[in-house]
Amino acid sequence: LRRVRVRHVGALEDDALAEELRQRTQVLCIVNNRRHARALFDAIAEQPGAHHLTTLMHARHRIAALTRVREELKAGRPCRLVAPSWIEAGVDGDFPTALRAEAGLDSVAQAAGRCNREGRRPTEASEVLVFSPVNWQPPQELKVFTEVFREIARTHSGDLLAMEAIHAYFQRLYRRLGDNLLDHEATLTQLRTADRGGQ
């Protein structure tokens, strides 16, 4: 992850976010829900290389869209992709810049994995800009993760992907969520029980 710089850029309204997407030739924008992704795509749809992905698309259409995205990136053509957070898992695009709506630090790290993936660009030219969407609240299930991320962004702004920042993030998250949701011993016990056939 030393291939990218991660910066928290604060609050962005959708108009400003759409302008960021217009100003960059190749950019990935990841938001926390598909309605937000659609709204942003609609704002930049006239731009060359504008793409939108959603889980509502048929798998065949998603694969075709991702193939076009990879081809455009490789050829150096304009490519502006807006998608909800599922794109973080298993999509192998290599963007020079990623914009990521606030979420957990692990999600920000996943977005960083889509930026300068092949390490061909200088780190200074490869950045992940994390923003707080003014027009969209984080989904309830992400609220605590987002709040803890903001705390870490204030205290570790120099390197949000440093081991110290990651450790601090998970420590604070553990304190906030409590033993019930992040209890490793309970998880291991459940796995051992399942391995013995539920006995």
Q: Where are the predicted features?
A:
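Conserved two-lobed SF2 helicase motor
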Residues: 73-88, 100
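Residue-level signal for beta-strand positions within conserved beta-sheet cores that form or flank
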Residues: 2, 77, 124
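C-terminal helicase lobe and adjacent C-terminal extensions/tails of nucleic-acid helicase motors
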Residues: 15-26, 30, 35, 39-66, ...
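Conserved P-loop NTPase nucleotide-binding/switch module
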Residues: 90-92
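Conserved phosphoryl-transfer motifs of two-component systems
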Residues: 97
